[in-house]
Amino acid sequence: MSVITRFAPSPTGFLHIGGARTALFNWLYAKHTGGKMLLRIEDTDRERSTEAAVRAIIDGLHWMGLSYDGSPISQFERAERHRQIAEQLVENGKAYYCYASPEELAEMREKARAEGRPPRYDGRWRNRDHSEAPQGIKPVIRIKAPEDGETIVHDRVQGDVRFPNKDLDDFIILRSDGSPTYMHAVVVDDHDMGVTHIIRGDDHLTNAARQTIIFKAMGWDIPVMAHIPLIHGENGAKLSKRHGALGVDAYRTMGYLPAALRNYLVRLGWSHGDDELMSLQDMISWFDIEDINKGAARFDLKKLDSINGHYMRMSNDQELFDAALDILPETDGGTEIIERLDEQRRVQFLKAIPHLKERSKTLCELIDNASFIFTQRPLQLNEKAQMLLDKNGRTILNDLYLALKACPSWDTKALDETLRSYIQTQNLKFGSIAQPLRAALTGCTTSPGVLDVLILLGRDESLYRINDQLITTVGL
């Protein structure tokens, strides 16, 4: 049997981080078994479903590197098929028309509330003849759920989960306007798509019991089910925006790499021994739904930062350069950088990446650490950098300006000899000259090594920047 999984999001917003992990698990299991992953858009809620959300979901999957087989399937466009199966269930005696009025249903709920039990439909139309139907009321179709015993969901993650049938009642599968309920549409679609494995969040477990009843009523094979634990925040509570419940597009804009996000998400609820960093091929080779944990996973942004930093350091410089430019329009200050990004600065930025990526955990940090390349003269020094250019710092800076101006050639060897000659003459340590020099060249107290910065900026720009600070500080 060829494995077919499916990712079935509702297009009511972005591809959130929990959905991305569900898609990843489905994709990995399909790849692990040599099967397929299909994409179904569950767009039956016409008021909340939008084309923009569909696009965001597909874009998010593509960015994550999670390809699906075939074309996306619209659940809404299959409404006629859902209706046909509901009618077939009635014909087979597995479902029935219910003409209970809204007033009757409200009365049932009120009675249940008064008796201290959950509201349940009382089955009053289950065995009544269709000829007794009242005038002017459009019926719904309800499934004939088992009245006693229990429905068992055989789950690869949760084990056997048992549901007393008395708690499930005769739920609606087709509304009075002819539209299918989610519960019914999902079963019909999974069957028609040939889905063999359903991998989704464990908040769908109760749905699984009701869907099992529909599968059995139709005499269809029930897919293997694996209900994975939800992702919680660092505080153990339900994941909120404050604790990471953002869309994949937000993580992209925050400067995370798709490979790093995949690596982080795969370990939320699944692991392979103590392996923390793993290649995509390793994930495909090792992943199995049998190894998914039952307990909720906690989202740890610091851990994601650490993993992303690793992938930054391991990435090709050109790829990082391209990825950084790609997110610039969506980052704070990115528009200004784009306006200043002439060919010379593009070359400087690319050359700086080997040094910048060693101290950057995200692309945004990489861009921020490269800000000295994009800034305009005269540089605005941050507070710490200003403190370095005190009287002693200015004296050193003035001496360095004269020494560098006289440097015979602007290469690493000549610049290093010039700086070390000054250090020996003045009996100083390298750090004591590097700090004021870095402040003047970058406006910051952290940057690549000062020799690297001097080479990146070139002779003219370096000397102009140093002189700017000497002119500024003289006037203080």
Swiss-Prot record:
It catalyses: tRNA(Glu) + L-glutamate + ATP = L-glutamyl-tRNA(Glu) + AMP + diphosphate. Gene3D superfamilies: 1.10.10.350, HUPs (3.40.50.620). CDD domains: GluRS_core. One of its GO terms (cellular component) is cytosol. Keywords: Aminoacyl-tRNA synthetase, ATP-binding, Cytoplasm, Ligase, Nucleotide-binding, Protein biosynthesis. Its main location: cytoplasm. One of its GO terms (biological process) is glutamyl-tRNA aminoacylation. It is found in: Cytoplasm. Its EC number is 6.1.1.17. ATP binds at K241. GO terms for molecular function: ATP binding; glutamate-tRNA ligase activity; tRNA binding; zinc ion binding. A motif ('HIGH' region) lies at residues 9-19. A motif ('KMSKS' region) lies at residues 238-242. The keyword Ligase applies. Monomer. Belongs to the class-I aminoacyl-tRNA synthetase family. Glutamate--tRNA ligase type 1 subfamily. Catalyzes the attachment of glutamate to tRNA(Glu) in a two-step reaction: glutamate is first activated by ATP to form Glu-AMP and then transferred to the acceptor end of tRNA(Glu). This is Glutamate--tRNA ligase 1. It comes from Bartonella tribocorum (strain CIP 105476 / IBS 506).
